[in-house]
Amino acid sequence: MVANKVLNGSLRRRAAELGIDIIEGVAVDRFEVGAATVAVRLADGVTLDARLLVAADGVRSRLREMAGIKTVEWDYGQSGIVCTVVHERPHGGRAEEHFLPAGPFATLPLKPDEQGRNRSSIVWTERREDAERIVAEDDLVFEVELEQRFGLKLGEISVDGPRRAWPLGLTLARGFVKPRFALAGDAAHGIHPIAGQGLNLGFKDAAALAEVVVEADRLGQDIGALDVLEDYERWRRFDTVQMGVTTDVLNRLFSNDFGPLRTLRDIGLGIVDRLPRLKDFFISQAAGTGEGIPRLLKGEAI
């Protein structure tokens, strides 16, 4: 797993190499779609014109709201606690996810830091009121709570850096595109982190949209035309809905200590482990591979 600040740093350096301007700290005030372009007016009064506006501004997307695209959504009553921990022993590149009554507890391997310390990223799901209480505790109490779930398999642990919690829910846009407008990433779909697939879905969106736009431009088509953008929507919509439903069912099944459901989930895990093709499907989804993968994610040029 790559730390967010490392990924952001790499993207910024690449953008600078390509001469891409990054405008920060200025919100979009409004946008207007014309026959050949879309005009985006920023809060500082600057207007930008383009053939296509891509909204990738998060699960509470203001641009999606401005475009009038509705969503299907519900709240899980859970929050995800995120932090980085330093531990004595190396993780060996192993990611783990444990299913607890309040929700999944995932340990994701990170590269050692500049001092060579072993590190992992934690995504820890709790009932919302408990998550708020845990995050507000002092460092010692927080680390005790964390150790109860993390265990001592990697030796002593300590929290490295800030910790935060964010509310979890399911949000699926009813449509991904309009003329000269496309949703991507969390603006199109916000899912439960139980399978760690939110970022992978966003990468697939970006790669698929890039492939559709490049191919349309190569053929002399208008990249902002609705029929072009609908190719992107058809490509990505089924995958995102499928993953949203899958994570919703898994969360309801595993984040539960009700006796019959506990038995059912144990049976379900046993079935998956004994059927290679079914197991391969879940592994391919977790790895962000499988059918319908854009060429960029396979390392191919477009």
Predicted regions and their residues:
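C-terminal helical "tail/cap" subdomain of flavin- and related membrane-associated enzymes
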Residues: E211-I302
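FAD/FMN-dependent oxidoreductases across multiple families
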Residues: D130-L226
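General small-molecule cofactor/ligand-binding pocket signal
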Residues: D21-I23, R164
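A conserved short coil-to-beta-strand element within the FAD-binding core of flavoproteins
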Residues: E24-V38
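Active-site acidic short loop of glycosyltransferases
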Residues: D49-R51, K178-P179
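Short, conserved active-site loop motifs that form the nucleotide-linked donor/cofactor pocket
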Residues: G19-D21, F181
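Conserved FAD-binding catalytic core of PHBH/FMO-like flavoproteins
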Residues: A39-R41, V46, L53-A165, A173
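Short beta-strand to alpha-helix junction loop
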Residues: M1-R14, A131-L140
